[in-house]
Amino acid sequence: MTPSELKRLYHITKVQLEYGLDELLPEHALTQLPKRLRKGLFWIKNKYPEKPLGERLRLALQELGPVWIKFGQMMSTRRDLFPPHLADQLALLQDQVAPFDGQLAKDQMEMELGGPLDNWFTDFDIKPLASASIAQVHTAKLKDSGREIVLKVIRPDIRPVIESDIRLMYRMARLVEQHIPEARRLKPVEVIEEYEKTLLDELDLRREASNAMQLRRNFEGSEELYVPEVILDLSSEHLMVSERIYGIQVSDIEQLEKNGTNMKLLAERGVSVFFTQVFRDSFFHADMHPGNVFVNPDNPENPQWIGLDCGIVGTLNKEDKRYLAENLLGFFNSDYHKVAQLHVDSGWVPADTNVEEFEFAIRMVCEPIFAKPLGEISFGHVLLNLFNTARRFNMEVQPQLVLLQKTLLYVEGLGRQLYPQLDLWATAKPFLETWMAKQVGPAAFVTALSEKAPFWAEKLPELPDLVYDSLRQGKVLNQRMDKLYAGYRQSKRQQAKGQFLFNVGATLLICSAVLLTSNITVLASISAATGAAFWLFSWRAYRR
């Protein structure tokens, strides 16, 4: 380790101990080395013993800086690894940091564009509109049209910081695996590998631009959701240019009401947007916290959501959607056995799981929720309770479903903040029933047939050749089968002959032994020689 890495490692360790995070690792679970290290740092005490452990964990990560904040945010989605009281606190982490020098941002943009900003933009504001740990946003206008745009640029100094802290995370993860046996099941090195990939992906704004363009296409012309246009010609790996929007932040209830917004419709549209993304598009914005969601102020009676920052998205395949739909319908029909069986059939819990025990565990946590009126039930908390229960049965949580559950909690929270009487079930049920109807029955058969029609239309002219090839291959196969069968019969005959010769030889050898005991040596010798000859012939027969 370099001196700077040792200094940083000491600072990380000091912060962790000052927040009492050594409580995460019970002393009985430690080997001798970490016990001695803890005693060696005796002067570092827990400064906040009155605060809950989850809150202390969140505060420590905030103090350690952007890389650790984002690590905590990612860990908040891994409810297969962390108990609820820790995961809930990690979900509260906010990625807010002081802006960096606007001139540095401008220099970085010009390097990405290959020339002065004046070649493409006017009215560039050197003061940032927003700032986060990975990127910063500035405003300007397009020179040729005067259109207002925003420029999102990656911090020029962030990669060395990320790489340095990631190296330390790997060292710490390996030490944890080596010296804390109980922590090995959490696979800390694999967790860091996953985080490194996620973080490095965020350094490439082309990925976010692609996500935004996909979401915009999906809701083209929609009254429910608007996604700002990306100016792709001016965007690159470390710079994304998109249209500037003006809206009311969705959490600003006072301003929304002052603008005369139809709060009931706005809340219902939030739920509708979510389920449309999931069941129609299989592609959803997975970071819909209040900072990324605005409301178009132009038509308050017909309010439209505006979605920003598409850096994190989720995708679902047919199996994922079927799992979600059948589970939710199973829950609302109180069919917990079906829910438990679905998990076993999908392979998300081990095949030897006791379905009755799993059903009972699900019933225990979900019955209190479903005792409420349907309008008060939280879908997000239903899935959350399901994940926490399945975790006890060694369920391997699917990342895309965890993202979906987190997004659903955001949408529900916003919806009920806007309109407390929001009945999510009334809004969601048509989506679930319509999607399920398309998956089973005649409609599903017709849909599947129409999806395969282009393939069969392409293959139809080849059908005669395919039939001829199949018949020819069948004839060749029959000939080979006849040869194999003839060989098999010949082999069986040889084996029978060999067995017969072996038995005769064995009989003659036994006779020679009897004759020898009676002192009839000549006959005994002839019998032994003949028996040996028969054995030799039997061996040759077997060899064939």
Curated annotation (Swiss-Prot):
It holds the Pfam family ABC1. It is found in: Cell inner membrane. Keywords: ATP-binding, Cell inner membrane, Cell membrane, Kinase, Membrane, Nucleotide-binding, Transferase, Transmembrane, Transmembrane helix, Ubiquinone biosynthesis. GO terms for biological process: regulation of ubiquinone biosynthetic process; ubiquinone biosynthetic process. Its EC number is 2.7.-.-. It is a single-pass membrane protein. Pathway: Cofactor biosynthesis; ubiquinone biosynthesis [regulation]. One of its GO terms (cellular component) is plasma membrane. ATP binds at L129, A130, S131, A132, S133, I134, A135, Q136, V137, K152. The active site is at D287. The chain crosses the membrane at residues 515-537. Residues 123-501 form the Protein kinase domain. Its main location: membrane. GO terms for molecular function: ATP binding; protein kinase activity. SUPFAM superfamilies: Protein kinase-like (PK-like). It is an enzyme of class 2 (transferase). HAMAP family: UbiB. Belongs to the ABC1 family. UbiB subfamily. Is probably a protein kinase regulator of UbiI activity which is involved in aerobic coenzyme Q (ubiquinone) biosynthesis. This is Probable protein kinase UbiB.
